[in-house]
């Protein structure tokens, strides 16, 4: 067989394998009540901390409108009554969310409050990304919560869940899709803004490393080493090919993050890898994405489930139909 024939054969086998691999998974899985309950509890803690933060509510103007601030004046967010009201509504909505009642009202309201708080904060002339993923998750879960009611109004019939699946199955699946999709969008924006040269140009990140370290120092003035040492930037600049391999790996991790939807093991390893990526960014650039890391830990890594699986493996034989 000629070389060209071998290449064609390998290509066809690879394409066949890929299509077969894509046929399995990528659908909502069975999620038990206790599993989804723990996720709700953990995520609710993040929502409370986010909406109890007073920073967004100290602004009474929007000098650089962002997002919906172009359409609506949000300067009222700085009035004295707003933050206490948001706190009360947050507690009420979070309680409803945790007990699994009234989510079709609680989740959209939480999503609205999170959107308003993030918008007024990002309308001050600088963009913050630390809370974005919380808002996206709330919007996604709000849509899932409202969907059965929309279906009932539109088709005049109750939306019935497929056998063995619960609403938790859909909440988790579409939350994972939103979280993973946000990283795909990040990779796509890098690709488009660099005209496809992001990986090749990645050694120039050395300049961003120095910039972010200086900004971190001048923000708090408590760590002189951030100014005195630039070893990471020097190493990146002096080792361009290694830099392309390292940063290119992170780029493709983001680009293919939606593989997390295939099944639980893939979700776990994609989640762990993205957390490691954030840890590396924090170590090199002092950019903290704590909320994003915790969301990955809750919805992709899903530690309670794997602890349960480990306990089953140690305590007895694996059941024929695992409780997933």
Model-found features: residue ranges?
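Alpha-helical membrane-anchoring segments
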Residues: 2-324
């Amino acid at each position: 067989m000629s070389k060209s024939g071998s290449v064609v054969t390998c290509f066809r086998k690879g394409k066949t394998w890929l299509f077969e691999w894509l046929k399995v998974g990528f659908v909502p899985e069975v999620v038990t009540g206790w599993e989804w309950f723990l996720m709700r509890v953990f995520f609710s803690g993040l929502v409370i901390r986010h909406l109890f933060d007073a920073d967004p509510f100290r602004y009474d103007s929007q000098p650089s409108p962002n997002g919906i601030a172009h359409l609506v004046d949000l300067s009222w967010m700085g009035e004295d009554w707003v933050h206490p009201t948001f706190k009360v509504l947050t507690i009420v909505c979070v309680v409803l969310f945790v007990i699994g009642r009234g989510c079709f009202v609680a989740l959209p309201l939480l999503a609205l409050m999170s959107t308003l708080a993030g918008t007024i904060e990002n309308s001050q002339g600088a963009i913050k990304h630390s809370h974005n993923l919380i808002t996206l998750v709330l919007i996604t879960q709000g849509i899932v919560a409202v969907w059965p009611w929309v279906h009932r109004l539109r088709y005049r019939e109750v939306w019935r869940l497929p056998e063995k699946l619960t609403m938790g199955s859909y909440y988790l699946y579409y939350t994972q899709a939103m979280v993973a999709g946000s990283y795909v969008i990040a990779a796509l924006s890098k690709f488009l803004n660099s005209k496809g040269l992001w990986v090749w140009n990645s050694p120039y990140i050395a300049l961003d490393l120095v910039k972010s370290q200086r900004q971190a120092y001048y923000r708090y003035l408590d760590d002189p080493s951030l100014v005195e040492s630039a070893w990471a930037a020097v190493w990146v600049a002096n080792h361009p090919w290694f830099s392309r391999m390292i940063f290119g790996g992170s780029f493709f991790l983001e680009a293919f993050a939606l593989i997390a939807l295939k099944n639980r093991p893939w979700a776990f390893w994609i989640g762990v890898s993205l957390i490691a990526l954030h840890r590396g960014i924090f170590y090199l650039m002092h950019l903290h994405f704590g909320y994003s890391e915790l969301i990955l830990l809750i919805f992709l890594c899903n530690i309670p489930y794997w602890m349960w699986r480990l306990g089953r493996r140690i305590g007895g034989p694996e059941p024929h139909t695992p409780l997933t």
